[in-house]
């Protein structure tokens, strides 16, 4: 019996070794696939800001926003310390958002970890600079989606690899500012979802010929309204349209009425990148 079983076992091992493994598909591709009458999404710029006591790029702020908007997206900025630790920070210097001073990339993590964050009103909070890893861990636990803005001093490949190592690809949309960067990241991982600037017909054509499938893209259509025909073309390809209302358009809505957010959805906007996530949620829910 043993003589018979051993060859069978060896055959089984060989068959298993020759069977191609099934590659896991990134579920974000389906999540960001445009569907007519789909739910409008809200992305909190810099993880949420503009609220007293809640600093930008702060994990506690994201938790606060998520309580009111369970499916909120969080745009975060990823920087690196002098000793190569990834953490959340928008500015190249520390003065505006922390109790520290000097250049971010000239401080080691031990120094940075001692600082406290300041809110938009220059009030010092009890909150501290979050590690990128801790934010990824939180996003996985809470099923949150991050849109990752990589600072110029940081290599995009390094950030992608860090996301992969932490098994957080399904929580991360990587923001790109050039088609070359988008192509580089897609080549490194064909499952990655990318935010790509498509603000006009020329950029649409560039994206269409870039060799990146539409399913890997979310279209950032800029910080001003585009011609609705652009939104329609993107929707035909199954691509969701993100409008950056942060800055001027948020100010316009605050002055003229938050009903403007509802009007922008009618033009074809699927995602708002905003400094006013709670107000946008209230406006589009009416």
Regions found by a protein language model. Name each.
Residues 6-7, 50:
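General helical structural elements
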Residues 1-4:
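Positively charged n-region of N-terminal signal peptides that target proteins for export
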Residues 7-16:
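Bacterial N-terminal signal peptides
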Residues 18-286:
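Phosphate-group recognition and catalysis centered on beta-loop-alpha active-site segments
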